[in-house]
Amino acid sequence: MYLTRMELDTDRRSTRKLLTSRSRIHGMVEGAFSGGRERRLWRLDSLGGRLYILVLSEEKPNLEAAVREYGNLEEGFLTREYEPLLTRITDQSQWRFRLVANPTQSISRASTGKRGKVRACAGVVQQEDWLRKRAGKHGFMMEEGGFRVVGNDWHIFHKREEKDRSVSLREVSYEGVLTVTDVEKFKELLCRGMGRGRAYGMGLLTIMRLP
């Protein structure tokens, strides 16, 4: 697998237009690959006043066209193999993490007990609880108070094939420290992501080893 980073030039008109729609960004990401429609993860990250797009994929991407239209021409894009990171993951190892996700919940109907409509987790308490409940399933744990919500945003856009229907996604950013409890499950999480909206910039968890 490969992790790719490209700086977006927000001074360019084309880039500002791109950022108005998650569907447009999804199209740009898909255009960087020649293969079939594999699952790819991506997200936007702000760092030091600059905006980057991260892309995690099985196939090595070609973002040259994207750089010409939306990127920083001097920086281009950087692709690194993901396997060296995966081989460093061991049981009980600790990592700083950042996750951008779409936390949701399904409330059962009192009258029937059937699963109800899926809704975004509205408050920070619900959003933190969503991640806490899923940690074990994905092979990690977090100490109480060991993570926090650092960002909340809404994205409303139209899918290219469904222009008559809008899509609303709540984006929640988490940061903290985790401990790996199941190496294989955790590696799968890193490669496949978590939650809904993964085609539209959600679900990618990145880690950095604690000193």
Task: Name the predicted role of every residue range.
Residues 1-211:
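RNA-interacting cores
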